[in-house]
């Protein structure tokens, strides 16, 4: 954001409330290109090289000043030729530049909010593993859990209306509608999954921004409920729903559905004890209260999605389970509640008696079946878990092949270091090791037995260093005490993206 701020200060024609003029600035496309978003699709696939990219941007800006190029026919998609024969190139360039521009209001607000605060203090909270210590600390005191998949809006105008609260520039909103119309069929109310997939791959930055703005709108309402929970008894249902911007749409549903739950005050939120955790599109709601409390929350969320976001959702698809009887699948881990019973002898004066003491503990396991399914999808093994050679890597050098397999193996052990039982990981390690050997044997046109007999089985040992050995090298003095106290379960605070675990760089 500091790079943007320097250019924006020099650009005196830009005003904070007007984003549309920035689409005519060359440095915006330079930023989008430098971030590496779809660089191959932007230049290489259309026959251009990096040296002529500046000429392409200048040609694009000169054509954008001709307003007739933005006139499109909504009835005939074949006639909607954006900028002539370079439709795909120019449309993608503008959408990437627009993705950079539309983030500016959010970035400026974030910078203003963080002024004078210690950002380093919250750096560890960015890690995916920071969620699991929270679950271990809180879930042992809770009773019920509900898995919630956040639905995506089926009408594209919902995304535009969500951004309207933050982006005051009407021209930018119209341009966003133009992009969405260019990617989808605007006459259809339901977005097919293939269009979402195409859009997310062609411009992931804009897609993630739109999705995050949608989730932010949804979570801001939940945050409002959480912060106002102690004052809800004095708030009527009509006034309450008006404060969250959808009173007009749900006036009648409130009278019909919540007639019994909201007589004159919102007693429904008494004794509020709710925890909320989300990663990407999956969230978890947990409570210590009764199933009736969770059931009312479920119907409230369904009504919120239907009336405020125009998303149809069925309450029956949001299951409410007891933590002690249900395994929770989240972020690649399988978590369940373990109850450890112990007998304690207590003595009072001359009388002694036995007491049963139950200790609740969250146990995190590695789901082996999904892992093998992922390895089979990447062609490291078959569906039964039998290792096979990676034929697409056979043309690489021996060191590169070993390094690729070792990279995936080390990162899997790194991510699943918090598992209480690592037997499943050793099976994954066996699959990757044998797949690596078969790939090397295939490259040298030999059998696995002959290849190992010639080079020895210790060939791969230095590349498949286990997590515990790495820790002993980093912390040689304190590792023995750490191992005895922590029993091998370690949560790391440097994992920010799951995709980084498998993408070899």
From Swiss-Prot:
GO CC terms, sorted: chloroplast
Alphabetical list of Pfam families matching this protein: Intron_maturas2 (PF01348), MatK_N (PF01824)
Main localization, broad class: plastid
Span of the signal peptide: none
Cellular location(s): Plastid, Chloroplast
GO biological process: mRNA processing; RNA splicing; tRNA processing
Keyword annotations of the record: Chloroplast, mRNA processing, Plastid, RNA-binding, tRNA processing
GO molecular-function terms, A-Z: RNA binding
Family to which this protein belongs: Belongs to the intron maturase 2 family. MatK subfamily.
Biological function: Usually encoded in the trnK tRNA gene intron. Probably assists in splicing its own and other chloroplast group II introns.
UniProt protein name: Maturase K
Organism: Ficus carica
Gene this protein is translated from: matK
């Amino acid at each position: 954001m500091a790079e943007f701020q320097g250019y924006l200060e020099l650009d005196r024609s830009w005003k904070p409330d007007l984003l549309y003029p920035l689409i005519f600035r060359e440095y915006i496309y330079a930023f989008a290109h430098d971030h590496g978003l779809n660089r191959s699709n932007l230049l290489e696939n259309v026959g251009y090289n990096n040296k002529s990219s500046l000429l392409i941007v200048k040609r694009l800006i000169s054509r954008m000043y001709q307003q007739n190029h933005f006139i499109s026919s909504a009835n005939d998609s074949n006639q909607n030729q954006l900028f002539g024969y370079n439709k795909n190139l120019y449309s993608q360039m503008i959408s990437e530049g627009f993705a950079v521009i539309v983030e500016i209001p959010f970035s400026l607000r974030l910078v203003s909010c963080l002024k004078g605060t210690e950002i380093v203090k919250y750096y560890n909270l960015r890690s995916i593993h920071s969620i699991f210590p929270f679950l271990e600390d809180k879930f042992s005191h809770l009773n019920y859990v509900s898995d919630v998949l956040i639905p995506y809006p089926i009408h594209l105008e919902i995304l535009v209306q969500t951004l309207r609260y933050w982006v005051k520039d009407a021209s930018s909103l119209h341009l966003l509608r133009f992009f969405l119309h260019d990617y989808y069929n605007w006459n259809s109310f339901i977005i097919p999954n293939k269009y979402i997939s195409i859009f997310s791959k062609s411009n992931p930055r804009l897609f993630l921004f739109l999705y995050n703005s949608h989730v932010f709108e949804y979570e801001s309402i939940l945050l409002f409920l959480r912060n106002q929970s102690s004052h809800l008894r004095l708030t009527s249902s009509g006034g309450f729903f008006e404060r969250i911007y959808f009173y007009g749409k749900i006036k009648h549903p409130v009278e019909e559905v919540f007639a019994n739950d909201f007589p004159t005050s919102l007693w429904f939120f008494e004794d509020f004890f709710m925890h909320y955790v989300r990663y990407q599109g999956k969230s978890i709601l947990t409570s210590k209260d009764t199933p009736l409390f969770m059931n009312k929350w479920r119907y409230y969320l369904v009504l919120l999605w239907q009336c405020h976001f125009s998303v149809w959702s069925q309450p029956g698809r949001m299951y409410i389970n007891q933590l002690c009887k249900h395994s929770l699948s989240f972020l690649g881990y399988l978590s369940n509640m373990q109850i450890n019973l112990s007998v304690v002898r207590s003595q009072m004066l001359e009388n002694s008696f036995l007491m049963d003491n139950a200790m609740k503990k969250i146990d995190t396991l590695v789901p082996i079946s999904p892992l093998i399914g992922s390895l089979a999808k990447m062609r490291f093994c078959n569906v039964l878990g039998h290792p096979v050679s990676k034929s697409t890597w056979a043309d690489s050098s021996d060191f590169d092949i070993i390094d690729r397999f070792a990279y995936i193996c080390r990162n899997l052990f790194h991510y699943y270091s918090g598992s209480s039982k690592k037997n499943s990981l050793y099976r994954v390690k066996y699959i990757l090791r044998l797949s690596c050997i078969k790939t090397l044997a295939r490259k040298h046109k030999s059998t696995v037995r002959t290849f190992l007999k010639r080079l020895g089985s210790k060939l791969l040992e230095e590349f498949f260093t286990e997590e515990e050995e790495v820790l002993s090298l980093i912390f040689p003095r304190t590792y023995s005490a750490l191992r005895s106290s922590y029993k091998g379960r370690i949560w790391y605070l440097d994992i920010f993206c799951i995709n980084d675990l498998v993408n070899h760089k």
